[in-house]
Amino acid sequence: MRYFTAGESHGPRLTAIIEGVPAGLSLSAEDINIELKRRQGGYGRGGRMKIESDQVEITSGVRHGKTIGSPITLNVTNRDFKNWEQIMAAQDVEDKIKKQRRLTKPRPGHADLVGGMKYEFEDLRNVLERSSARETTMRVAVGAVAKKLLHELEIEVANHVVNFGGREISSPEHLSVQEIRETAGRSDLSIFDESQAEDLRTYIDQIKKAGDTIGGIIETRVEGVPAGLGSYVQYDRKLDAKIAGAVVSINAFKGVEFGLGFEAGKRPGSQVMDEIIWSENKGYTRSSNQLGGFEGGMTNGEQLIVRGVMKPIPTLYKPLMSIDTESHEPYKASVERSDPTALPAAGVVMENVVATVVAQEICDKFNSDTINELKKALVDYKKRLSEY
């Protein structure tokens, strides 16, 4: 299973093509729209979310509500395109139009300057349009398909914010996907402890008033994953490495950890490793889950616990200093639409990205043409594991 995305932030539409989804999976546009709506929610979101109300159009790979094994094409129209039609036109236009919304003042922390240098662009909008977080719309759309597939296999995924701009959010160590959905899933801040919500909203409002932004840490948990996904035999087959790469590929994500994560480096081994236990009913399990469900790059049958750190949004309403690429004179950086934080939305993106990697691994391992064949292969595999 693989996918590609295409489209610019202010272009006519965003597109994703997914290949390798087994035939027979029930799938509707509404399944995807639910996830797209989640991405556009959350406290602290602003202008673009009021303009866009994303709706997907499925144009291939699904017939009469079922996948048919061929590539699935997903399209999301940019409703704001009518205001950008000439500026973002594919055909050549007059110079006076080209100069409209031209960007020569790169924003610190964005791809603007380095992208312009790399591709020899005079107008840095060519970089901004693709490097924008708007691209994550299609990462979520793809993830919605992956989550539907995982649900059929009794694998579930959820996320919550565990740190908001340096403020820790309290949550229990043992936390099920269902508990996350019933708490953080109903919070506009995506937090487990709603008693902290009002203070956080005040904090976000203060950050917005100051023209600044905040980041934080998001935790995604996955349940129902069997042991043995991924492999230790080559570096690029380790599933935790694949997940880490996928998470840091999300706009503004700068780090990943599993289980104890970086805390493990501060403790002796006896306080880090998860002891192995066995019972006739459950087979091999662990006494704890401090390694976040991974050993040797492989799932060990425990809940997957993945955290990603998101830097503050780099577009500031009180912009930092930059250099104009035409004059080389110092200027305050350009200001596009921005929010004080996008953590709740970023959590939805991370959740769907992690789900996609897990679904890809399952499809690659069991290589089934139909969803029924995939289900049977997974049942047989779990039976083999239970007999070890």
From Swiss-Prot:
From which domain of life does this come?
A: Bacteria
Which InterPro entries did the record assign? Chorismate_synth, Chorismate_synth_AroC_sf, Chorismate_synthase_CS
The GO terms describing molecular function are: chorismate synthase activity; FMN binding
Q: Which residues bind FMN?
A: R130, S131, S132, N251, A252, G296, K311, P312, I313, P314, T315, R337
Q: Name one GO biological process term.
A: chorismate biosynthetic process
Q: Where does NADP(+) bind?
A: R39, R45
Cofactor names from the entry are: FMNH2
Record text on cofactor binding = Reduced FMN (FMNH(2)).
Q: What is its EC number?
A: 4.2.3.5
- Write out the pathway annotation from the protein's UniProt entry: Metabolic intermediate biosynthesis; chorismate biosynthesis; chorismate from D-erythrose 4-phosphate and phosphoenolpyruvate: step 7/7
Cellular component terms per the entry's GO annotation: cytosol
**Function of this protein?**
This reaction introduces a second double bond into the aromatic ring system.
Q: Which HAMAP family match?
A: Chorismate_synth
Assembly and interactions? Homotetramer.
The name this protein goes by in its record: Chorismate synthase
Task: Identify the gene encoding this protein.
Answer: aroC
